[in-house]
Amino acid sequence: MNAPDKFASLLALTREPFPASTKSYLAGSQPGLRVPVRDIQLTNGEVVSVYDTSGPYTDPAVQIDVRKGLASVRGEWIAARGDTEGYEGRVRKALDDGQKAEDGDRLAQLRAEAAALQRQPLRARSGANVTQMHYAKKGIVTPEMEYVALRENGRREWMQQYMQDTAREQRLAGNPLGASIPKIITPEFVRDEVARGRAIIPANINHPEVEPMAIGRNFKVKINANIGNSAVTSSIEEEVEKLVWAIRWGADNVMDLSTGKNIHTTRDWIVRNSPVPIGTVPIYQALEKVGGIAEDLTWEIFRDTLIEQAEQGVDYFTIHAGVRLAYIQLTAARRTGIVSRGGSIMAKWCMAHHKESFLYTHFEDICDIMKAYDVSFSLGDGLRPGCASDANDEAQFAELHTLGELTQIAWKHDVQTMIEGPGHVPMHMIQANMTEQLKTCHEAPFYTLGPLTIDIAPGYDHIASAIGAAMIGWMGTAMLCYVTPKEHLGLPDRDDVKQGIIAYKIAAHAADVAKGHPGARARDDALSQARFDFRWQDQFNLGLDPDTAKEYHDETLPKDSAKVAHFCSMCGPKFCSMKITQEVREFAQQGLQSKAEEFNRTGGELYVPIHRAD
């Protein structure tokens, strides 16, 4: 792999701070609790602070060596609680990386390159429970909860100038559609939401590098990006670079969906270098361990895989425990059958053995593993619809009902839980999904893949799905799983990753504005004001993608002088509506001034006497 050279070149661009941006930190109540924000310096002297997911990669003051991983954020907090213990951990096997021989040259090379990324695993002490939900139910406000509160609030002082018009704010007030969003997020509010199961803070005790974040209906809508190799393409260094690229553009969480070789080592590199929570679908690696033959899967192999990944620091597992034997026949009349990889694997296993899935029958055993490491459940929708004509059918909602039952079992163990959702759903059927999920799953956070609203957009599915994502985000979904232009077509590269993330940042932000999340619209107002003032650089820099905005502008007006011009190439200097509006305002102001002078000349009386000739 020659990791040092390849990573150095791949990460060079990704470490560049955004234009006119600097990293700053909000201080918490205890030493070491520092929450990052990105400050955008405007040409008029204003500073706009925005939520930041890029971790230390965009902080020039931080030295990063990806061969060793990121510095710990939470290590001292975890140790201070006194309820964990270090231990030797399971023995790493060649099969973990898809290798058959323990003494192979390739395996030795992989392990040597990842040697500095190894950590002694932690687990809960005997009889202890180390989940954020457990602490929350006991009334404990953890540093992670305070971190989340500071992060959700951000630095709000700059917003006030855009929120002073009371009439405007009332006119534009959002509709939360049943959500309960306070004006200020307090640590106690975070604790209460986690205790109720309405929010999760995915943060494995073996992932101390993670910057805590919350997924819940009453917080900002989050987005997830998927990366991972396949049996056909990609490499470890490419996947790590995709991770850093994804969080640069705004991915709140990242899932490693690797299905090819070197799965274990790829995950070492990803987790140790990730400041955001990492999720996986453990059944993928378990399937690799049995040569891709679903029928050969066993509970013992799956259990070993869960512990393996929990020790590495994975923050949440997608587990398709809701795929029950009786539900499989409900998919027979579908146009596209079972489209979830995990769902199809478990369906095949159930049919081959003609009994319930071991994920379902051993669910409480899985809970015991989850709570020992604080791994969150992402209960998978293995029977989600794969096309619009299969949406909201009996199979989909039967599984959802089971996921609601499993959620209550997980909560009995104080295991944090979110619910995965579709998929492909026409616009007029989206609300029914949200309503059913809130009722059936007891307000556990909903995490949806889109949904795609139409099926005729190959190459543009990121747009077709962002429409549904914006809608369901407004209705109450807590996290949106991005879709890239390559959906249904192939493994996304870094450009596809960026396009998918930007589409979903748009959807999530639109949902926050519609819900009336405090201050959500202020950045829009700042950009609108920059646009009206013809502050082109500020327009670029306030956008979600400054690079593309500047590139499009400069295709026709590349000179520096165009950055202060009061027009663009769309309308030119004579037909710019904003320039004309400014001129109209100037004329109106001049007219008012003229009338004021006339008023003063006539004596300053409101009513001027009329002198009539006798």
Swiss-Prot record:
GO biological process, one term: thiamine biosynthetic process
Pfam families the record matches: ThiC-associated, ThiC_Rad_SAM
Reactions it catalyzes: 5-amino-1-(5-phospho-beta-D-ribosyl)imidazole + S-adenosyl-L-methionine = 4-amino-2-methyl-5-(phosphooxymethyl)pyrimidine + CO + 5'-deoxyadenosine + formate + L-methionine + 3 H(+)
Keyword S-adenosyl-L-methionine: yes
Molecular function terms from GO: 4 iron, 4 sulfur cluster binding; carbon-carbon lyase activity; zinc ion binding
UniProt-annotated binding residues for substrate: 226, 255, 284, 320, 340-342, 381-384, 420, 447
Keyword flag S-adenosyl-L-methionine: yes
Keywords: 4Fe-4S, Iron, Iron-sulfur, Lyase, Metal-binding, S-adenosyl-L-methionine, Thiamine biosynthesis, Zinc
Record-level GO cellular component terms: cytosol
Co-factor note (free text): Binds 1 [4Fe-4S] cluster per subunit. The cluster is coordinated with 3 cysteines and an exchangeable S-adenosyl-L-methionine.
UniProt-listed Enzyme Commission number(s): 4.1.99.17
Pathway assignment: Cofactor biosynthesis; thiamine diphosphate biosynthesis
Positions bound to [4Fe-4S] cluster: 568, 571, 576
Binding site for Zn(2+): 424, 488
Cofactor(s), names only, from the UniProt record: [4Fe-4S] cluster
Top EC class for this record: lyase
Similarity section: Belongs to the ThiC family.
Known function: Catalyzes the synthesis of the hydroxymethylpyrimidine phosphate (HMP-P) moiety of thiamine from aminoimidazole ribotide (AIR) in a radical S-adenosyl-L-methionine (SAM)-dependent reaction.
PANTHER family referenced in this protein's UniProt entry, alphabetically: PHOSPHOMETHYLPYRIMIDINE SYNTHASE, CHLOROPLASTIC, THIAMINE BIOSYNTHESIS PROTEIN THIC
Subunit record text: Homodimer.
Protein's UniProt name: Phosphomethylpyrimidine synthase
Originating species: Acidovorax sp. (strain JS42)
